[in-house]
C-alpha cells in the first residue's frame, strides 16, 4: 500500500503539520467493523414509528469466492440502505444464499465431498469476504435455501400452490444422457449436442414432471408491467416480449378421408389463410402416429429419432436450415377447399401453441425457406407495391396489403381481412378468435440431488398425495454416494424413497425429483421480513411492514426468469390470501458488468495473461509475436482479466474499493477496471484524512455552534459549497441513483474547504462544513467516515446521524461570476452583483478590460446578455 508521504498534497492550504498519524485502512476498518458488530449498528429496527425501507441485493450462489461483480452489486445496495437510514427510515438490509443447484452437486461428484458441507464452507468464506467490505447487513436475518429451516417453507408454499390448482404433472421433454442414464440441464449439453461428462450424443426424452401454471397469470404479469414505473424500461420490455401476447385465430383443417378428425393451428395472420400450401405438425404431436401412412411410417420414425437429439434452441435457431418429411396425410383448406399435404418438421414444437402450424410461404420467411427446400407451392395472397418482386426473389412479404387469390375476400385490406375471415370461419365452425402467449408453464422438476425435495408421495392406490404439513420438511438424505450416473440420485436411496402412503397407509414412494432452484429464489424476500417464524413462512403483518422491496439491485441477466417467477409467486400467494401485496419489487436497479482488460490473439483466438505481455504499449503474443487485440470484457478466469477483491482491499482498504467501484461509472453502465483510478480514489481519501486531521486541531466537538451574524467571504463561500453539495448529493441519491456524480460533489466540497484554508474559517462554519462532509461521505466510505466523526468529537456512530439538511439561504450569493465573450469566444470573466439585470450587465461588460482589449474602442453591433451567466459582445 502506498504511504501517505509518497502522495503530493493537493491543497497546500491544509496544515499537514497537524497530522497525528498515517491513514492505515487495514487496522482502521477492522476496528470499526468489530465496533459496529458489538454495538449492533446494522440491526434492523423492528418496533417504532419510523417508515420501513427494504433494500435488497439479489442474493448470490455461494461459490466461495467473491468477485468484483458481487462487490459492485452489494456496495450499491449498501449506499442506498445507509442513506435511507440517515434519512430517518427503519431499514431492512439482509443477505442470504441461493445455495441449491448443479454447481455444488458437480463439485461434490468431482471432489467426493458432501454438497452440504461444501456449500456451508463456501458460505462461511463469502460471509467473511462480505464483512470486509463494511456492508451494513443485518446478519441476524441470514437465510440459506439449502438449510431445512428454509426449504421446509419452500415445500409448504409448493403445497399451497398444489392445493390452489397451480401445480400439476404432465409429460415433458428432457435432455437424456444415454451413457450415464441421467437427465441433463441445458447448460450440461455442449454446442455439439453432447453430454459435458460422458461425451455421449444427448437425446430428447419424455418424462412425467411437475409444472406450475404461470400461464394462468400471463395477462396480469403483462398488464401490471405498466405499474412498475421504478423499473428500467429495458427490463419491462424484455418481460413483455417473453410473455409474448399474440392476437389471432385458431383454424381447424379437416383431415382428408377421416371423419371428424381435424388439425388445429394458431395463426396471427388469418388474412393469409388462402396462401397456405402445407400444414406442419411437431414430431412429438400425438396426431403423428395416427395420421402417418404405412408408406411413410419408417421415414417418419427415423426423422423423429433425429429430432430427438436436438435441443429446443437448435430446433428454433433462425440461422439453422429447417428440415422435415411428409407423413402421407392431407388436410383441406377450410377457406379454399384446396388439399394440402401434412408434414412434420424440426422447427415446430409440441409445447408451443397447438403443436401445429400452417405454412404460408409467400408471407412468412421461415415458411418460404422450407417450401423452397422441399418443392412446396408458393401462393401470393397479399398484394402491395414490391410484394411480387420480393416473393420472386425468395423474400416473404410480411407487411400489410390487399388480399388477392382469396376468393370473395379479394380487394379487402389485410388488416380488415383478419377479422372478416375469422368471423366467416366462426360462422362455419372452423375458426375462432384466440389470444395466446409465448409464455409456457414453468417446469420445476429437476432430476438432481442438491435441490429442494418435492413434498409428494406416489401411491398406486391414491395417486400423488401431498406430504402432510406437520411432516415437513422432507429432508434430503445426507452422506449418499453421488456418481452422476443412473438417473436421479434420490431414486437410488431405497430407505428414503419407500414410505407408507399418508392417506391409506399402503406402501408408496416419495417423489424423487427436486425443485428448480428458482423456486427458492421466488419468495426469499418474503422470508427476510419474518426470518425466525416457526409457525409459517411469514406473517402477513411482517410482509405488510416491509414489502414491497423499495429498492432491488441485481444483474440484467435476471431480467426475465427470476424477476418473472418472483412476480408470479407474489401474485399467486396474494390470491391464496397469504399476502396483500401485488408486486414484490417497487424499484429495480440493474447494475452494469465489471470489465477487465484482455489481450487476445485474433489469429488463434487465445487469450494471453497480462503478466505475459511484455509491453502494454505494443502488446504481442509471447509465443507467436502476433499483435494482440486489447479489449475490455466481463471478468473471467479464462480471459485472465479478473481482479481479486481481497487483493484490492489488502492494498488500499475497503473504502477505496467502494469509492472506485461507485465513482468509475454510473451504476447501470458497464465499468472498466483501471488500477490508476483505484490509486486515484486512494489519494482522494488520503487528502480527506489530512483535511480532517487539520480540522480536528481546531474542533473537538460536533455539537452545533452559533454562527456569527456577519459571515466572512470565506465562511460564505464554504457554506455555499457545503449546501450545494448537500443539494446535489441528495438529488443524486433520490429517484435517479447516480453514485458517481455524488462522489464528484464530495470532491468539489473537500476542494472548496481545502482551497479556502482551515484557518480562514470561523469555528462554527468549519464545524458545520466538516460535519456535513463526513455525513455525506458516510454511505460511500463508512469506515473512514466513522473515524472522522470520532476524531472530530461526534457523539455515537456517524451511521446513526441524520442526513445533512439543505439551508437554501446559504445558496444566495451577493455576487456571481459571468463569462465575457467576444463573437462567441470566451475572452474573460467578471464578478458582478448577483442582482444585476441585463442593462447593468451590459454596462459592466462594456466597461471591462476585456471589452477594451478586444473591441479596441469600437462599439459592438450587438450585445447578447444571459443574466447570471454571460455577456456576448458582437463587433
From Swiss-Prot:
Residue span of motif 'HIGH' region: 60-70
Polar residues bias: start-end ranges: 1-20
Motif ('KMSKS' region): 634-638
Species name: Synechococcus sp. (strain CC9605)
GO cellular component assignments: cytosol
Pfam families linked: Anticodon_1, tRNA-synt_1, tRNA-synt_1_2, tRNA-synt_1g
Family (UniProt): Belongs to the class-I aminoacyl-tRNA synthetase family.
Root EC class: ligase
Subcellular location: Cytoplasm
Catalysis: reaction(s): tRNA(Leu) + L-leucine + ATP = L-leucyl-tRNA(Leu) + AMP + diphosphate
PANTHER family: LEUCINE--TRNA LIGASE, MITOCHONDRIAL, LEUCYL-TRNA SYNTHETASE
NCBIfam families noted in UniProt: leuS_bact
GO annotation terms (biological process): leucyl-tRNA aminoacylation
EC number: 6.1.1.4
Membrane-spanning residues: none
Main location group: cytoplasm
Keywords: Aminoacyl-tRNA synthetase, ATP-binding, Cytoplasm, Ligase, Nucleotide-binding, Protein biosynthesis
InterPro entries: aa-tRNA-synth_I_CS, aa-tRNA-synth_Ia, Leu-tRNA-ligase, Leu_tRNA-synth_edit, M/V/L/I-tRNA-synth_anticd-bd, Methionyl/Leucyl_tRNA_Synth, Rossmann-like_a/b/a_fold, tRNAsynth_Ia_anticodon-bd
Protein's gene: leuS
Cited SUPFAM superfamilies: Anticodon-binding domain of a subclass of class I aminoacyl-tRNA synthetases, Nucleotidylyl transferase, ValRS/IleRS/LeuRS editing domain
Chain positions covered by the region annotation Disordered: 1-22
Binding residues annotated for ATP, in chain numbering: 637
Name of the protein: Leucine--tRNA ligase
Molecular function GO terms recorded: aminoacyl-tRNA deacylase activity; ATP binding; leucine-tRNA ligase activity
Domain of life: Bacteria
